[in-house]
Design a protein with these regions (language model features):
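N-terminal Rossmann NAD(P)H-binding glycine-rich loop of SDR-like oxidoreductase domains
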Residues: 3-23
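SDR active-site strand-loop-helix element
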Residues: 6, 30, 68-71, 101-107, ...
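N-terminal Rossmann-fold cofactor-binding loop
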Residues: 30-35, 50-51
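NAD(P)-cofactor binding segment of oxidoreductase domains
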Residues: 74-101, 131-135
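Substrate-positioning beta->alpha
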Residues: 81-82, 132, 150, 178-188
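Conserved beta-loop-beta element that borders a ligand/cofactor-binding pocket
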Residues: 137-159
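Glycine/proline-rich active-site loop of Rossmann-fold NAD(P)-dependent oxidoreductases
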Residues: 159-164, 190-198
C-alpha cells in the first residue's frame, strides 16, 4: 500500500512509521524539519512543510491508498493542531481524489463524552485538547471520505502486547490503558483491512 502519514514524528507516529515500512508499504510523511525522524528507508519519502501550505500537504497525499493522521497536541504547543491540520488534509484529499482516511481521536470525544463520570472529569482537566478532538471528529464526519476515527483511552509507552480489544460498542473502565505500539499496530491493520469504515472504534488492553 501507499500510505500518507501525518504526525510520524510523534510518540505513536514513530511506531506506526516503523511498522508500515517493516510491512513493506510505501510511506510519505510531512515533517516540520528534515531531522524530525531518524528513520531512513528507500520506501520512505519525507516532505518538509507546514499544514498551511496546501500544495505541500497535497503532495503528501497524492496517490495514497490511505491517509493516516496520528497528530496530537503537545505540552506547550498549539491546542488546535488536530482540527486545524484536518482542514488542510481534507482539502488536499479532495484535490487529489483520495478517499480513505484514518484519524486518531480519543475515547471521550464527541458522543462518547458522557460515557462515565471519569470521562467527564478527564474532559475538564484537558478541556482544550478534547475540544480539539471534538472539532476534528466533526470535520471528519462531514468529509465525504471513507473515514475511521480511532478512540483509545490513556496511552502508555509500554511494549506492544498484541492483546488489545477493539470495537464500536466497548466501554473501557477507569484503569483501561493502551501501549502506543499496540495503537500503531491497530491503526495499520485498519488501513490494510479496510475495517471500520464510517465508524469510531475504541481500542484498549
Amino acid at each position: 500500500m501507499r500510505l500518507a502519514i501525518f504526525g510520524a514524528s510523534g510518540a505513536t507516529g514513530r511506531h506506526l512509521l516503523q511498522l508500515s515500512l517493516d510491512a513493506g508499504h510505501t510511506v510519505t510523511v510531512l515533517l516540520r524539519s528534515a531531522d524530525s525522524v531518524s528513520i531512513r528507508h528507500p520506501a520512505l519519502t519525507a516532505v518538509v512543510g507546514q499544514f498551511d501550505q496546501l500544495a505541500t500537504v497535497a503532495s503528501v497525499v497524492q496517490g495514497a491508498d490511505a491517509v493516516i493522521s496520528v497528530l496530537g497536541a503537545r505540552k506547550g504547543g498549539a491546542q488546535t493542531i488536530c482540527s486545524d491540520a484536518m482542514r488542510s488534509i481534507m482539502l488536499a484529499m479532495q484535490a487529489k481524489g483520495v478517499r480513505r482516511l484514518i484519524a486518531l481521536s480519543a475515547y471521550g470525544a464527541a458522543e462518547s463524552r458522557d460515557a462515565s463520570w471519569f470521562i467527564r472529569f478527564v474532559r475538564m482537566v484537558i478541556a482544550d485538547r478534547m475540544r480539539d478532538k471534538d472539532a476534528m471528529e466533526a470535520l471528519v464526519h462531514s468529509s465525504g471520505t471513507d473515514w475511521t476515527l480511532v478512540r483509545p483511552p490513556a496511552l502508555t509507552n509500554g511494549e506492544a502486547s498484541g492483546r488489545y480489544r477493539s470495537g464500536t460498542g466497548l466501554r473501557p473502565g477507569i484503569t483501561a490503558r493502551l501501549p502506543r505500539a499496540d495503537l500503531a499496530a491497530f491503526i495499520l491493520h485498519t488501513a490494510e483491512s479496510g475495517a471500520f469504515i464510517g465508524q469510531a472504534p475504541v481500542v484498549f488492553t
